[in-house]
Amino acid sequence: EKLNDGFARDLLELETCIAHIADAPETPALQPEALQTLNAESVMESQYLPRAALRIMRFAHNIHAYYDAVVHQKSQPRCEATPLWLAVFRDDDAVWRLPLSRGEARLLIALQKEKTLSQAIDLAHTDMLAENEDVAALLHHYLQRWMQHRLLSHTHLPQAQSLERNMQCA
């Protein structure tokens, strides 16, 4: 089947992204133990910083299925326009692709912009609600998935909130 221009452009963007991710600096993955020390308020007011070798991309075509078929020498799917959000990341010197929902992608993009989890949820709330009315359960699912795929680098409480909390304890 002849590739259309939009599909070819998406495929080129993915290939370029994979090359950049392969060269991006490696940052250590967040370990689950780091989350165990946070209380409920700290969880929401912390920043969860994604790893440096992570890009969130939006495509007009499902190039992930096509790329996967080519890599694994399967029959190639039709190159129809199907919107796709995709995380492209490196872990242990291997480049990976992970399809995302729109809400999950919007949340990760907000975290890349150093928003707190609470701020990121505010930005992605409408998209998350479209997926599941139980935003808390959806958030739990996202965090589990991100930890499983090692997408996050570290977490920290923004300085102003940390200082305020220390003053309240004094």
Predicted feature residues:
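Long, charge-rich, low-complexity alpha-helical segments
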Residues: 1-39, 93, 98-170
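A general structural signal for short secondary-structure junctions and capping/turn motifs
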Residues: 10-11, 44-49, 77-79, 144
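Hydrophobic, aromatic-enriched interface-forming segments
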Residues: 24, 40, 45-55, 59
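Intrinsically disordered, low-complexity boundary segments flanking structured domains
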Residues: 37-46, 71-76
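Sequence-level detector for tyrosine residue identity
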Residues: 48, 66-67, 142, 149
